[in-house]
Amino acid sequence: ITETGSTSYSAELTGLQSGTDYEVRALAGGSEGDVYSFQTETIVTLPNMNFETWTQDGKTWYPNPVADNLDDPQAYWATGNEGVTIYKESSTVPVTGSDAYKGKSAKMYTYGDILLVGAAAGNLFIGTYKTNVGKPESSPSFGRAYSGARPTKLSGYYKYKSMPVTYAGTVPGNLKTDQCHIYLRLWDDAGQEIAYGEFIGTETVTEYTKFEFDIKYSNTESKPAKIAIVATSSKYGGDFDENGKKVIGQVGDGSTLWVDEF
């Protein structure tokens, strides 16, 4: 129990069960406080967090049980593959065998020479994707509806091949070697961000290694209504010019991120 000032106290309860009703009452000496009831939030399992499920349609890979990352009810994750395969092979693909951590893993590859847009970082995210050739920046939409408990951490396994910056973007401007990026963001039902956490990989890691980061809440009162988890082989590959047409982030052609078991 923690005392704040002279009259305020707080206590942390551990070992509570998900989605369960509880009653609590404070005892001090021989005095009993009022009984208060509360319900713990329900833990929700997100689909395909082990990246075992993939579907291929032509050159395009989808991290879903259907060849869709837009409006099919079975689609939950998305990639930018539909846009990339206009010019190249899919930049986000499943891998197996010695290239995987367990079963299948996701591999993301950065192209530093894409016609018109300039560059394309491999990505994998909870959300939707619909190619907008006129404004590529608006093609992805990050996040899907979420009504589960407030997560406190995100962990998983990754390895990374960081390449020297070859695409002469202006953001951040002084980057010498590429960086990978994994983050989680939560919004409330008003669309306001309430929590965020991230992992940034700055060097080559040749063997699968565990990553873990805390999720920090800027608002602990509002309940989460939307969640996004995003992974990319180039942290600045999603930075576009003011018209949303051309990448201005610095990336390294050939940078590759592998992830598994979120």
What does each model-found stretch correspond to?
Residues 13-20:
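Surface-exposed, short loops/turns at beta-strand junctions within beta-sandwich domains
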Residues 52-53, 109-113, 144-163, 170-174:
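Solvent-exposed strand-to-loop "edge" motifs in beta-rich extracellular domains
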Residues 35-89:
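Extracellular carbohydrate-recognition regions
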Residues 96-115:
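Short carbohydrate-recognition loop motifs
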Residues 42-43, 151, 160-204:
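Extracellular ligand-binding interfaces
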Residues 189-240, 252:
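Extracellular carbohydrate recognition and processing domains
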Residues 235-262:
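Extracellular carbohydrate recognition
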Residues 23-27, 228-230:
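Extracellular recognition modules
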